[in-house]
């Protein structure tokens, strides 16, 4: 089975800041798309996925501070308790930077398992802040979306690595 992840012998080009900013914008807009019923249960936090991807792939370009501001941006757009996404995204970014080398050693599907843990922790942190703020506990289906996000991880990684790949790969096998 072919692997679409960056191979060890392949050197990726650095990501362009404009490309990173556009992917952040698309993640933000994807979070704002309305979903109802079962689709709402399956909808992952796209902005968290993009933040996680860039913190793992380009840690010098995306860090805890940028994740914090993206979280504040999400809080304002969601009209939720101010700071809940900011805290969760900042902790997610720190965790991604901490486990970065470990995650990069795995294939995309093994990375997805690691990403699932990070996304579940992020969702639990948002839930904790909501509950402390007085919101009722959601149903168990609240934790389905982070698992769907982990399943989206390989596709997201392939799509975001495409512009970074060299034009012609002349690697001898």
Cite the ranges covered by each PLM segment.
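Terminal, non-globular segments
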Residues: 1-173
């Amino acid at each position: 089975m072919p692997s679409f992840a960056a191979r060890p012998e392949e050197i990726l080009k650095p990501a362009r800041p404009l490309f990173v900013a556009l992917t952040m914008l698309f993640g933000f807009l994807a979070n704002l798309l309305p979903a109802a019923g079962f689709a709402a249960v399956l909808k992952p936090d796209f902005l968290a996925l993009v933040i996680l991807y860039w913190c793992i792939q380009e840690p010098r370009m995306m860090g805890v501070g940028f994740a914090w501001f993206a979280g504040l941006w999400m809080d304002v757009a969601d009209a939720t308790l101010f700071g809940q996404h900011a805290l969760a995204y900042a902790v997610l970014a720190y965790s991604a930077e901490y486990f970065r080398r470990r995650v990069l050693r795995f294939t995309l599907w093994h990375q997805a398992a690691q990403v699932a843990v990070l996304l579940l922790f992020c969702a639990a942190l948002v839930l904790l802040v909501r509950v402390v703020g007085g919101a009722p506990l959601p149903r168990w289906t609240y934790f389905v979306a982070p698992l769907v996000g982990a399943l989206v991880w390989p596709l997201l990684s392939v799509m975001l690595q495409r512009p970074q790949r060299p034009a012609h790969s002349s690697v001898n096998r």
